[in-house]
Amino acid sequence: MSSGPVQPAASDATDEAQSEPIIELAGVDFGYTATPGVRDVTLQVDPGEYGAVVGPNGSGKSTLMQLMLGLLKPDEGIARLFGEPSHEFDDGSRIGYVAQSASASKEMPITVREVVKMGRFPHVGFGRLSEEDWEIVDRSLDTVGMTAFADRRVTKLSGGQRQRAFIARALAGEADLLVLDEPTVGVDAESVDAFYDLLETLNHDGITILLIEHDLGAVVDRAERVVCLNREVYFDGPTTEFAESDALSRAFGATASVLSDSQ
C-alpha cells in the first residue's frame, strides 16, 4: 500500500479546474520601443464568461490580447493562462483564435472541411485522422451551420461564412476559450446578427467567449461584460453599466449618447 498523499477524487479535480480562472493579469505593463503599450492592467476571465475588450484604434487592445494568450511576455506584472504563465502555456487545443484577417482569407485554396480538420492537429498531429476525429469535424461543421459548404473552397465563401469556418476549426479542437479579434470586419449586417447569435449559443454551451472590438455597437447588446481600454483599463464590469460610466468619454472622447445611438 502506498504511503503517499491521498489523491483528490476525479470530480473534485474537475470542479477545481472549472473554477480556475482562464486568464489572470495582475499589474501588467508592456511597452514597445517607439510606442506605448498597456500599463497596470489587472483583470480576470472566468470559465463561461462572454466578455469584450473595447477601445479606440491604437488603444492597446491587440497588445493586451497577445499578453493574455502568451504571445507577449509582460515587462512587469503577472500573466497566467489556464493557471500557467501565459508565455509558457503550450496546449493550443484549449484556445480557439479567430483573427480579423480570417474574414479576408480569400487566398486559401483549400476546402472548408480541410480548414476544420486543422483543429484536430493539436490532438493527433499531422497524420491521418481517425473515424472519431472526422465525426468531431462533421459535428463542428454542423454546429456552425456549415455542413452544406464542407467541400466548398474557402475562396468561394462570404466573409461571414469564412468566420464560421474558422470557429468550426476551434470547435474541432475542443477549445475552452474562443478569442475573436474584430470578427465582423467586412461582414454584411445580416450575417453579423447571425454570427453573434452563434456566439451566444456557443457560450450557452459552455465555451468562454472573448471579443476584441473597437465597434461599441457590435458588442453592447451581446457581451455580458466589457473591459474598456485605452492603454489602461478605464472600465471593467457589466455591459449594462458601461454606458452610464465616465469610461466612455475618457477612453473614446465621446459621450454616453454616442453609445446609445450606435445600438
Sequence positions of predicted segments:
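H-loop (His-switch) and adjacent beta-strand-loop-beta switch element
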Residues: R225-T239
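Catalytic Walker B motif of ABC-type/P-loop ATPase nucleotide-binding domains
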Residues: L178-E182
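Helix-to-loop junction immediately C-terminal to a conserved catalytic motif
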Residues: L69
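H-loop/switch region of ABC-family ATPase nucleotide-binding domains
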Residues: E213-H214
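Conserved ABC transporter NBD signature motif
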Residues: G77-I95
